[in-house]
Curated annotation (Swiss-Prot):
This is DNA ligase. It comes from Ehrlichia canis (strain Jake). Zn(2+) binds at C401, C404, C419, C425. The lineage of its organism: Bacteria, Pseudomonadati, Pseudomonadota, Alphaproteobacteria, Rickettsiales. DNA ligase that catalyzes the formation of phosphodiester linkages between 5'-phosphoryl and 3'-hydroxyl groups in double-stranded DNA using NAD as a coenzyme and as the energy source for the reaction. It is essential for DNA replication and repair of damaged DNA. It is an enzyme of class 6 (ligase). Belongs to the NAD-dependent DNA ligase family. LigA subfamily. GO terms for cellular component: cytosol. Its cofactor is Mg(2+); Mn(2+). Residues 594-677 form the BRCT domain.
Amino acid sequence: MKQEEAKLELDKLNSQIQHHDFLYYTQDNPQITDAEYDVLCHKRNLILESFPELASNNNYQDNVGSTPDAKFAKVKHAEKMLSLDNAFNQQDIEKFITRTKKLLDMDNSQSIAISCELKIDGLSFSVIYKKGEISQASTRGNGYFGENITNNVKTIKNLPHTIQNAPDSLEVRGEIYIDRSDFIQLNKDGNNFANPRNAAAGSVRQLDINITAQRKLKYFMYTIVNTKCLTQEETLNQLKTLGFCVNEHTITTNNIEDALNFYNQFYNNRSNISYDIDGIIYKVNDIKSQHILGATNKSPRWAIAYKFPAAEAKTLVNKISIQIGRTGVLTPIAELSPINIGGVIVTRASLHNKSEIERKDIREGDYVIVKRAGDVIPQVVDVDKNLRAQELTKFIFPTTCPSCGSNLFQAEQEVSIYCTGELFCKNQILEKIKHFVSKDAFNIIGFGKKQLLFFYEQGLITNIVDIFTLEEKISNSDLKLESLHGWGEKSIHNLFSAINNSKTISLENFIFALGIRFVGKYIAKILAKHFLSYEKWYHEMLRLAQDENYLLNIQQIGHKTIHSLKMFFTEQHNLDTINNLVRHLTITDAKTTSHLSLLHGKTIVFTGELSNMSRHEAKTKSETAGAKVSSSLSKNTDFLIVGNNPGSKYKKAQSLNIQILTEDLWLQYISPNTNEN
């Protein structure tokens, strides 16, 4: 390749990389896999190695991430947020070690301590504390400037808002992520994220922080900017002491074989971890050596990321079917010829949405590249159009719901398309009924998935109203329930008793039970406390058809939630279902408090078994009293409530000087000052 050709190819690669950086970092919507992106970068680096004179005019090679999104305020990083160079094989790691020793004037026979950490597949962020209080949080952005996400980050559970004994100024950096199980539930609840990383990034970069607050975001911190610690190992321990979440899977070793075994261990067992990782990060452990090694404009010389290879394979799309979730989102699914990917037989893959099918032009009969994204959810990443038969036609996305025929709706600036049939749509019904009887809704004990499926298949429960006429239907039918396997007189009696007991329900739980898109437990509670009675709430929901802006006066209710409520209450099927449902129910008014409890605004944690109620009931009572209930202790915990046989949290609370309450004392704290109307 001549230099002129190399320059043209370099410009082309830079343009492609810049485009995909924007999609990944700013839009949270990557269109190629990590492996494909790495190939582009590798090609660019090969050209620069062969033609170093082109490097001086190749400004884009120094970029990190992408330009901050204009919808967020810009934040200048005091210390540039660098990305890491990648290694793709064992030889790259060996070269990294050799090069590091050479730069440190070490003999190659000398050992060097390396910190080995998991590479979390999430969103990099920085948090600055001033005099122990959160002052600012930001994304990486382009490395020089990030996006101000302070209010969004404050909603992340277990992130300290206040740090005791902190220096006047402290900057920590880490990775925001979401567990795979929470990601799956998020998509079941009406979202359509491609993978957990996109879900985490999209959740953090919401203009409406109430949406961020509803997402179960987590984080790990991995560094302190300008740390006074002597080693990376010491830095991680210091972060723990300050109350931050730090990943437990780390080792420090002088042996390269141990470092590579660490990689192999997690590559082979990463599906056993609850969150996505996409490699291992190796860092020189000694901080002084890190300073000596320094950094290029893009990445530190003292660290490298050893990426996991993508698990991909090619197979045939036999059919494209449409799956309808609980909240009505239509998700296209590729029905595949069985293929082994990473030891797992894959027969179906997500196509995400209509836009994704159109962009990739995926057709029934195509040969496609399938990747197990995050080792869990297979997705189609590309089409081999060289193998496409001429007679294959474009896939036509349905214009009405394939299940119930209701209208489809697509919100502005959203890729998800969903059915407006809600409580009428057959494909949504079973999932909605499961949600309806769940613990935070009607809490009908003994109504598990198997029982629901049985009654559904028998035609006895085809909508949520049928639950409350089930006993009458069975008594008037030829079905002898007690004679069937798994049913006895006691279990039947308990089920019908649970159904009858659930007929009195709080307004908050009733609203949540309806399973309206974007109306989770938190929003249901806000709506209930605002309208107080069912009659008032229902009347105001009907107003949405004429005027949806009035709901904006309710703090923490955003445009997406309002529009979702409007779509629900303008569908006559849903109104008919609600009106039939309330005939069987007593919906109690929301409770108001005229005095604050002693726990109002406090963070509490429970340990041990409670004598008077379940942990779930205790959590509900505490939250009603204004407390925040956490599952883990930190310096930000105000009280530990101790039941019988307390666990290790009891000793930890003592060491952190956290106030300890007995169950009886806790009951006094939430009761005496609370006056319920």
